[in-house]
Amino acid sequence: MREILEDICCSEVRVVVGEGSLSKLSKIKDNNAAVIYSRKISIADKINKYLPNAYFIPINDGESTKELSSVISLVEKLFEKNFDRGDYIIGVGGGTVTDVAGFLASIYLRGLNLINVPTTFLGMVDAAIGGKNGVNFNNIKNLIGTFYQPSMIISDLEFLETLPIEELKKGLAEVIKYGLTLDKELYDYLSLNKEKILNKDKQALEDIIFRSTLDKLSIVKEDERETKGIRIVLNFGHTIGHAIEAGSSFNVPHGYAISVGMVCEAKMAEELGYAEEGVVEDVLWLLQIYGLPYDISQIDAPVDLKLALNAINMDKKHRKDVILIPFPTRIGSWKKVEVPLDTVKGFAEQCLKK
């Protein structure tokens, strides 16, 4: 079990990674706590072991839950239970659950204490870290949201024991993103430890979760609210990736959309002269050895080009007639570039044609 303690803006964030880390919940056993959790998982017994008086609220784990109406129903439940600002919201589940729980915690009484307990690999390496929370609106992902840091993130490897390999792969796309843009040592570790990682070796998983958490927190600490142009690096692959998600009406898993998005954006970087020759090959090679999609033809769900291009128009990195995109320049390095909107959409059209 390993811990990270980081000061982000005005908040202290503690991350605990490793088997048995759920026991850290006992630190708040005397506090009132609402556990927002995915209906897909049986969690009550595990949580009650450390929080015998917890109030459990099940929600669906999917993009359909990330709606304002869902959050309002949760607000009503907290109001009925007389929650106050000293109480806790604990989000237990995948990225959808921690997004909703974080958004709820940030708006109720202007802020309750928040703990994230990701139960998916994607949640542990990305979604539960960084303080971004939000809900979708008009087919635009996370259009309404807040920045609100959890006081603790608990990444307990026991949740991954029964995780299907396909779910592991969906999270690996984000880990690969860190390696490509920020952390050559992580890229090399992924290159050398494929068998261990895909066989869910606990030490290997702990290593990459811990390293990914450090990488993401190092960026968030410098630019929590995306005002300095640093946090944008975490969006490599996401301009095209989010377009794929929107074009499929969110039927394409996030990790797979980002995987294809990274290839498209790496091609853009190389063709526009911002990346060293060979970067696209490096991206493709690592995605291929982990069995991740690298071409839109490998995505099962249909992707509507009109919806996808509209999502690019609505991209949060869109500024007038350009989009800010973080390009990998070589493995472990990146550069923020202003790319004309029409150029981005042109590359997107090429990438999204099956």
From Swiss-Prot:
Its cofactor is NAD(+); Co(2+); Zn(2+). InterPro entries: Dehydroquinate_synthase, DHQ_synth_AroB, DHQ_synth_fam, DHQS/DOIS_N, DHQS_C. It comes from the Archaea. It catalyses: 7-phospho-2-dehydro-3-deoxy-D-arabino-heptonate = 3-dehydroquinate + phosphate. One of its GO terms (cellular component) is cytoplasm. Its main location: cytoplasm. It is an enzyme of class 4 (lyase). Keywords: Amino-acid biosynthesis, Aromatic amino acid biosynthesis, Cobalt, Cytoplasm, Lyase, Metal-binding, NAD, Nucleotide-binding, Zinc. GO terms for biological process: amino acid biosynthetic process; aromatic amino acid family biosynthetic process; chorismate biosynthetic process. Its EC number is 4.2.3.4. NAD(+) binds at residues 61-66, 119-120, 132, 141, 159-162. Catalyzes the conversion of 3-deoxy-D-arabino-heptulosonate 7-phosphate (DAHP) to dehydroquinate (DHQ). This is 3-dehydroquinate synthase. It comes from Saccharolobus solfataricus (strain ATCC 35092 / DSM 1617 / JCM 11322 / P2).
